[in-house]
């Protein structure tokens, strides 16, 4: 399961709701080195990320907020091997595409909300880098527009749906033979 969206679009909130509704869902904790939040990550060093990259052990890596993040094959496989449905949080279309090489039925979900909602949610949760979150919202919008034919299973406006409604829509998509297809991204992001 891939939840793609800008900061404040509800990735954490909807993941929490998914895990509340079904015990087999689990947040995939990306590797992280650098400042900022630590909850929801496996903290490591840049040296360990580099070593995994050289060994072909990474599906994707990126930098944002002065930190480095990575999705490792071994960590993802370990979660799947326990019978869990991994929920990956993504902020780049390239990352959502890169992890698709991992052999799993990927449900690809765009979570979207307007800029003012991202800003209000960021302030509401006490982020000290609201400006960086707003900048990332713009980057995510541009990323989506640059890849508007990228296939997605669902697009959800999280400012128009409750977390429970969003989670149930995702569960339905996972349970159904839903396939990813191009969506009207320009209409979604305005």
Segments (PLM) and residue ranges:
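ATP-binding Walker
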Residues: 9
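Hydrophobic anchor at the beta1->P-loop junction of P-loop NTPases
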Residues: 3
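Post-Walker A helix-loop "phosphate-sensing" segment adjacent to the P-loop in P-loop NTPases
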Residues: 20-29
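Walker A/P-loop
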Residues: 12
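P-loop (Walker A) phosphate-binding loop of NTP-binding proteins
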Residues: 6
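ATP-dependent small-molecule kinase phosphotransfer cores
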Residues: 30-86, 90-93
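Small-molecule kinase domains that catalyze NTP-dependent phosphoryl transfer to phosphate-bearing small molecules
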Residues: 96, 124-190
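Conserved phosphate-donor/acceptor-positioning beta-strand/loop module used by diverse small-molecule
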Residues: 87-91, 102-124, 156
């Amino acid at each position: 399961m891939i939840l793609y969206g800008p900061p404040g679009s509800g990735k954490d909130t909807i993941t929490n709701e998914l895990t509340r509704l079904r015990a087999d869902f689990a947040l995939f904790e990306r590797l992280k080195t650098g400042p900022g939040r630590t909850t929801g990550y496996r903290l490591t060093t840049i040296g360990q990320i580099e070593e995994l990259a050289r060994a072909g052990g990474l599906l994707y890596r990126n930098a944002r907020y002065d930190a480095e993040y990575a999705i490792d094959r071994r960590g993802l496989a370990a979660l799947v091997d326990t019978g869990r449905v991994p929920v990956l949080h993504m902020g780049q279309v390239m990352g959502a595409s890169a992890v698709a090489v991992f052999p799993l039925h990927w449900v690809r979900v765009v979570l979207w909300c307007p800029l003012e909602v991202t800003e209000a949610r960021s302030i509401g949760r006490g982020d000290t880098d609201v400006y960086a979150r707003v900048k990332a919202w713009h980057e995510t919008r541009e990323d989506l527009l640059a890849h508007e034919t990228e296939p997605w299973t669902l697009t959800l406006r999280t400012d128009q749906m409750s977390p429970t409604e969003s989670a149930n829509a995702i569960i339905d998509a996972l349970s159904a033979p839903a396939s990813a297809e191009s969506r009207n991204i320009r209409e979604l992001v305005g």
